[in-house]
Regions:
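Short linear sequence motif anchored by a di-proline
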Residues: 1-255
Length: 255
C-alpha cells in the first residue's frame, strides 16, 4: 500500500520531468501523510498543470464527507468497477510526483519502517485518480487517491501491495484521458520491474507525522536500532482508528 511518501527534488527539476506549465516553489517534504495537500499533475485543455489536492479521495456523489471514509489508495484490479473510482479512471487520471515512499514490514509482532526509492534515485510518478467534490453551498474540494497493485517478489518482502509508478515514457498515455480510454491504460497498472527499487530500514521517528526532516530517510544506525528495540517490544496500546481507508480495508462493493 502507500500511506506516506517523500518529495525532495528541487521544484525546477520536477517541472522538467513532469512537464507542467506552472513553476511552483515548495519546500522538501519527508513525511507526507493522508489528508494533507499534495502536488498533483493533470492535463486540462491539452496542457499539463500542477495542482494541489487533498490526499484521500472523496467521490462526487458523497453527500456528507464527515460520514465518509477517505480513500487514500485504489486497487488497480477493481478501479474499472468500483463506484468510487470508475469515473476517475476514465476522466481524471493524474500523477503524483515523489522521490520515494515508506512501508512498514511486519516481523515478529513488530512493524519496522523502510524507505523505498528508485535505485537510480530519480523521481517517480505515482499513478493517481482525482475527484472534485462539490458541497451544498458550491464549495469545491479536489481530492486524490494513489493506485496500488500486487507487489513483485522483491518488494513483496515488505508488503503485498505497492503504489503504481508510471514510466515517463507513458506519462502522455496515462494523463491523456481523451486520447486513451481506461481499458487502454490498464496495462500500466502493475508493480515496478524487480530490481528497479531499493530500500533500507529507517528510524521509527517516521511514525509520527509531525516529524518531517531529512534524517527520516537515512538508514537506521546500530545505536538507534538498539534504543528502539525495547519500544518495539512493548505491546502497542489500542488507538482510535483514523477515518482513512486503504486497499487492505474491507471496503465492500461500494468502493
Amino acid at each position: 500500500m502507500c500511506g506516506r511518501f517523500v518529495i525532495t527534488s528541487p521544484p525546477a527539476a520536477l517541472r522538467q520531468i513532469f512537464g507542467y506549465l506552472e513553476q511552483p516553489n515548495f519546500p522538501p517534504r519527508h513525511n507526507i501523510a493522508p489528508t494533507q495537500p499534495i502536488p498533483v499533475v493533470m492535463v486540462e485543455n491539452g496542457v499539463r498543470h500542477f495542482r494541489l489536492m487533498r490526499w484521500g479521495l472523496l467521490p462526487a456523489w458523497v453527500k456528507d464527507p464527515r460520514k465518509f471514509t477517505l480513500l487514500i489508495n485504489a486497487r488497480a484490479e477493481t478501479v474499472l468497477e468500483k463506484p468510487a473510482f470508475k469515473n476517475a479512471i476514465k476522466r481524471r487520471r493524474c500523477l503524483i510526483p515523489a522521490d520515494g515512499y515508506y512501508e512498514w514490514q511486519a516481523s515478529e509482532g513488530r512493524k519496522r519502517p523502510h524507505f523505498i526509492y528508485r535505485r537510480d534515485r530519480q523521481p517517480i510518478g505515482l499513478a493517481g485518480l482525482a475527484e472534485t467534490w462539490i458541497g451544498p453551498n458550491g464549495e469545491e474540494l479536489d481530492t486524490v487517491a494513489i493506485v496500488t497493485a500486487p507487489a513483485g517478489a522483491d518488494l513483496g518482502v515488505l508488503h503485498h501491495r505497492v503504489p503504481v509508478t508510471i514510466d515517463p515514457g507513458d506519462f502522455d498515455r496515462w494523463l491523456g484521458c481523451r486520447a486513451y480510454d481506461a481499458e487502454t491504460v490498464m496495462a500500466l497498472l502493475t508493480a515496478p520491474e524487480e530490481g528497479e527499487f531499493g530500500w533500507h530500514e529507517i528510524s521509527t521517528r517516521v511514525n509520527r507525522v509531525a516529524n518531517d526532516d531529512a534524517q527520516l530517510v537515512l538508514p537506521i544506525s546500530a545505536e538507534e536500532m538498539a534504543a528502539e528495540a525495547p519500544k518495539l517490544a512493548r505491546k502497542a496500546s489500542p488507538r482510535q482508528a483514523a477515518a482513512v481507508a486503504t486497499e487492505d480495508d474491507e471496503q465492500g462493493s461500494l468502493f
